[in-house]
Amino acid sequence: AVNPTGCDAVEPVAVRALDLINKGRDGYLFQLLRVADAHLDKVESIAVYYLVESDCPVLSRKHWDDCELNVTVIGQCKLAGPEDLSVNDFNCTTSSVSSALTNMRARGGEGTSYFLDFSVRNCSSHHFPRHHIFGFCRADLFYDVEASDLETPKDIVTNCEVFHRRFSAVQHHLGRPFHSGEHEHSPAGRPPFKPSGSKDHGHPHESYNFRCPPPLEHKNHSDSPPFQARAPLPFPPPGLRCPHPPFGTKGNHRPPHDHSSDEHHPHGHHPHGHHPHGHHPHGHHPPDNDFYDHGPCDPPPHRPPPRHSKERGPGKGHFRFHWRPTGYIHRLPSLKKGEVLPLPEANFPSFSLPNHNNPLQPEIQAFPQSASESCPGTFNIKFLHISKFFAYTLPK
């Protein structure tokens, strides 16, 4: 039976589980801030944990204990897995919080600066192939004293972490000095900088620094395709590759011929279709990706039904099964002041294939809906300033 257990007591298990999730991630990696809820299903010496975790990302392929943290994006995960250090399934939600922390106007003797945080996306309705991207950006805008024209800042510095299915956390830095007497001419009279993520059409003084993350160890990425998408922020030239195909928590590659570029939104809803204090609805998911990060683009047309695979078992002929990916991470738009990050749904499949390596392992049960009395656990004291973005209690 699935019973509540102590959050602080299972923290080492949660840390190991996040390490497994991070092995399949490119770009943002998760660090444990707190175990928010925990349940345990124990049969003899076999245990399956059901965890709700609050996480903080870092931008490095190193182990997160060795990284310097820059808290701009937070996340929460629900996961289920046995104590033999494998993760059966998980769902996560992430969102940028720096807008709620750092959006401000600073005035000095020589000028006025604005510090903004915003998310960018490519949801073009044009007829060329759509390659969905999503990213979080931080922009610093500087104006002369008492400047009334907000469309022509004297200087703009923008840093973005942009996510694309063919690239891993490509970091973009845009510096745009505006010299005396110089003006930016925006298309259709629109301002040159839009926090909503409008397209940038280039400027002679722009400088771009493109960086691919370090390669994953012991993995062959020689077949990675070049980048070919059009995006709202500048991307690496076509010859630059960031060859990091993601890996699953069980060590398996993504299918090698994944041509899907559609993003999926469960039930056809926008990620913020529900109040931020409620659950985030997650229904069916695309069948042809392992770790698939969902950005806030409009839902695509209905996808064809999932493919079926046929396997031959020893002496049992053919049987059919659905290939299902392990784990989903859903990116939500930036949080505003007073909002909390919605929890993901734990819509894990009601069935589980038998574990031939450990036949005594109990089947994965429905994720517990009630909160454990000895939870949540202790919040990481270094990051108490972002604890307000997490709900302290689960819905009863």
Swiss-Prot record:
Residues 266-284, 304-322 have a biased composition (Basic residues). Glycans are attached at residues 70, 91, 122, 220. Residues 176-322 are annotated as: Disordered. Residues 197-208, 255-265, 285-296 have a biased composition (Basic and acidic residues). GO terms for biological process: antimicrobial humoral immune response mediated by antimicrobial peptide; defense response to fungus; fibrinolysis; negative regulation of angiogenesis; negative regulation of blood vessel endothelial cell migration; negative regulation of cell adhesion; negative regulation of cell adhesion mediated by integrin; negative regulation of cell growth. It is found in: Secreted. The modification Phosphoserine is found at residue 309. The record marks 230-231 as: Cleavage. The keyword Acyltransferase does not apply. GO terms for cellular component: extracellular region. N-glycosylated. Disulfide bonds join 7-375, 56-67, 77-92, 123-297, 137-160, 212-242. Keywords: Blood coagulation, Copper, Disulfide bond, Fibrinolysis, Glycoprotein, Hemostasis, Heparin-binding, Phosphoprotein, Repeat, Secreted, Zinc. Residues 1-102, 103-169 form the Cystatin domain. The His-rich (HRR) region contains approximately 12 tandem internal repeats of the 5-residue G[H/P][H/P]PH consensus sequence. HRR binds heparan sulfate and possesses antiangiogenic, antibacterial and antifungal properties through binding Candida cells, and preferentially lysing the ergosterol-containing liposomes at low pH. The tandem repeats also bind divalent metal ions and heme. The cystatin domains can also bind heparan sulfate. Binding is enhanced in the presence of zinc ions. Interacts (via the HRR domain) with TPM1; the interaction appears to contribute to the antiangiogenic properties of the HRR domain. Interacts with THBS1 (via the TSP type I repeats); the interaction blocks the antiangiogenic effect of THBS1 with CD36. Interacts with PLG (via its Kringle domains); the interaction tethers PLG to the cell surface and enhances its activation. Interacts with THBS2; the interaction blocks the antiangiogenic effect of THBS2 with CD36. Plasma glycoprotein that binds a number of ligands such as heme, heparin, heparan sulfate, thrombospondin, plasminogen, and divalent metal ions. Inhibits rosette formation. Acts as an adapter protein and implicated in regulating many processes such as immune complex and pathogen clearance, cell adhesion, angiogenesis, coagulation and fibrinolysis. Mediates clearance of necrotic cells through enhancing the phagocytosis of necrotic cells in a heparan sulfate-dependent pathway. This process can be regulated by the presence of certain HRG ligands such as heparin and zinc ions. This is Histidine-rich glycoprotein. It comes from Bos taurus (Bovine). The lineage of its organism: Eukaryota, Metazoa, Chordata, Craniata, Vertebrata. The gene is HRG.
